[in-house]
């Protein structure tokens, strides 16, 4: 048996498509097909035995199939989970506004206190390696609610911390446990939406990934400079995250098909005393070796052997690093260079970046909604390279914004001229990020979880590192040349989507991980 033949994705496909048994039938008609596991040697004219005890969906309209949820409920779930992800990413950057204050309070350098941001992002790198596998073994809800609850709890020691070590250690665990929501949400969206309808939901989720970290320093700046003080950056996060977490506890059910069918089979065994009832997941439960290979070994194997995954991951990692570095760069520009006096006001220019990311996500929705149905009707499928058109647009928009931001850094230049540079930066971030990840999913399909696990690990490590060297770089080079350096790096990445747009099909044809469709 190949290592991939027992993947949870494969089990899910089996569980969602096989319809060999209906559970909505009179109990007296339930029977155990004791011949279903007979010898595979069959006589002439014989076909395979049907296993009447294999529990699957009762039909395409099975009410317990998450794909058949009412549309309103699907969107309640989508918006709730997106808001939970907003507060997780919000928590990663709200502390950035407290770096200056806490460094003075505890008598350490700002670089040390910047670890409060970097360690949270580092937790984002490690967490999915745990929460991803758990969500496919025991279902979506258990790891999600457990991780999110602990994420909320770890806000408390930060709020009452009496030393730097408590803050830094707890900030790491805030990222580690908070990423349970980030790791589980894409799976939930895949569970409840068909591929045709999933694009809008994924764009909403992707927008949350940008709104949270941008919103964090703005709120944090006003909180830190108010009578509340920096400790309320933790209390506000706790209040907001807990409120939405309780709402999710009420409205978000289990959505992982194989787990739902496994529980249905267990209920039938108890009600009928027929212990032959089982689900596809009972037949092929994921083993420890499967999980280790899929989430720990295969991602690195793919990063080494797959040029598409490696180069797109490097590009997305740069984008992620730039996003988190800006939470250091903006205070330097507006508090130190322009000599604004209020941290919250100095963070308001980040709203231009947020508006740009929203514009980028809306562009993706508009283009996808208009071009994909036509191509699907004409070709029967849409090649993954179609995603790269907007990614190429973003690859031009990002460096334009970075150079614009850098060379309008002067007190003699009106602040609005520099603030406006955030809009093309935001568009570039969104188009590269969302379309890059969508491209990887389309390329690797059933191996997408492994591909995204490797991508998440690398990009989060880069995102954790950038704020640490960002402040020294901006102080030494100045805002002009530090931003230009990022702009030159972005220009160097432009050939990646261009090359894969033209040569992607040939490269995919040589890949052992990209299905030949």
Swiss-Prot record:
Its main location: membrane. Keywords: Glycoprotein, Membrane, Transmembrane, Transmembrane helix, Transport, Virulence. Residues 1-45 are annotated as: Disordered. InterPro entries: MFS, MFS_dom, MFS_trans_sf. The chain crosses the membrane at residues 75-95, 111-131, 141-161, 172-192, 204-224, 232-252, 308-328, 347-367, 390-410, 421-441, 457-475, 485-505. Pfam families: MFS_1. It is a multi-pass membrane protein. Gene3D superfamilies: MFS general substrate transporter like domains. Glycans are attached at residue 19. SUPFAM superfamilies: MFS general substrate transporter. It comes from the Eukaryota. One of its GO terms (molecular function) is transmembrane transporter activity. Residues 1-12 have a biased composition (Basic and acidic residues). One of its GO terms (cellular component) is plasma membrane. It is found in: Membrane. Belongs to the major facilitator superfamily. CAR1 family. MFS transporter; part of the gene cluster that mediates the biosynthesis the mycotoxin ascochitine, an o-quinone methide that plays a possible protective role against other microbial competitors in nature and is considered to be important for pathogenicity of legume-associated Didymella species. This is Ascochitine biosynthesis cluster MFS transporter.
């Amino acid at each position: 048996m190949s290592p991939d033949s027992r993947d949870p994705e494969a089990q899910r496909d089996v569980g969602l498509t096989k319809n060999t048994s209906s559970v909505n039938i009179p109990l007296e008609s339930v029977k155990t097909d004791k011949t279903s596991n007979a010898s595979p040697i069959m006589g002439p004219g014989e076909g395979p035995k049907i296993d009447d005890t294999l529990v699957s969906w009762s039909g395409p309209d099975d009410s317990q199939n998450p794909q058949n949820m009412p549309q309103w409920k699907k969107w309640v779930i989508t918006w709730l989970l997106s808001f939970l992800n907003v507060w997780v990413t919000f928590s990663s950057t709200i502390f950035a506004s407290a770096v200056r204050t806490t460094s003075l309070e505890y008598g350490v350098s700002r670089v040390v206190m910047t670890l409060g941001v970097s360690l949270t992002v580092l937790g984002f790198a490690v967490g999915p390696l745990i929460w991803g596998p758990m969500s496919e073994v025991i279902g979506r809800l258990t790891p999600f609610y457990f991780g999110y609850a602990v994420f909320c709890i770890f806000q408390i020691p930060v709020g009452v911390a009496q030393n730097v070590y408590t803050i830094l250690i707890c900030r790491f665990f805030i990222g580690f446990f908070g990423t349970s929501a980030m790791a589980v949400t894409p799976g939930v969206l895949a569970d409840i939406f068909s591929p045709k309808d999933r694009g809008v939901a994924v764009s909403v989720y992707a927008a949350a990934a940008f709104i949270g970290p941008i919103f964090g320093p703005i709120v944090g700046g006003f909180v830190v400079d108010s009578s509340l003080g920096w400790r309320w950056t933790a209390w506000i996060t706790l209040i907001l995250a807990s409120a939405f977490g309780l709402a999710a506890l009420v409205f978000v059910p289990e959505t992982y098909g194989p787990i739902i069918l496994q529980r249905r089979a267990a209920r039938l065994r108890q009600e009928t005393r027929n212990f032959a009832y089982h689900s596809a997941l009972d037949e092929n439960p994921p083993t420890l070796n499967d999980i280790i290979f899929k989430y720990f070994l295969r991602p690195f194997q793919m990063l080494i052997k797959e040029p598409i995954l490696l180069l797109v991951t490097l590009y997305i990692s740069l984008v992620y690093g730039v996003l988190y570095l800006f939470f250091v760069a903006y205070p330097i520009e507006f508090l130190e260079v322009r000599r604004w006096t209020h941290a919250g006001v100095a963070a308001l220019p980040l709203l231009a970046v947020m508006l740009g990311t929203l514009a980028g996500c809306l562009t993706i929705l508009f283009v996808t909604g208009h071009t994909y149905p036509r191509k699907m009707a004409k070709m029967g499928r849409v090649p993954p390279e179609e995603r790269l058109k907007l990614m190429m647009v973003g690859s031009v928009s990002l460096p334009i914004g970075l150079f614009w931001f850098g060379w309008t850094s002067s007190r003699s230049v009106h602040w609005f001229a520099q603030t406006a540079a955030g809009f093309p930066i935001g568009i570039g971030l969104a188009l590269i990020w969302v379309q890059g990840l969508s491209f990887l999913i389309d390329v690797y399909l059933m191996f997408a979880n492994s591909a995204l696990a490797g991508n998440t690990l690398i990009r989060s490590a880069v995102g954790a590192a950038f704020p640490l060297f960002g402040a020294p770089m901006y102080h030494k080079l100045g805002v002009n040349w530090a931003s230009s350096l990022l702009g030159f790096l972005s220009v160097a990445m432009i050939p990646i989507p261009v090359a894969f747009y033209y040569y992607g099909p040939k490269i995919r044809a040589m890949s052992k991980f990209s299905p030949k469709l």
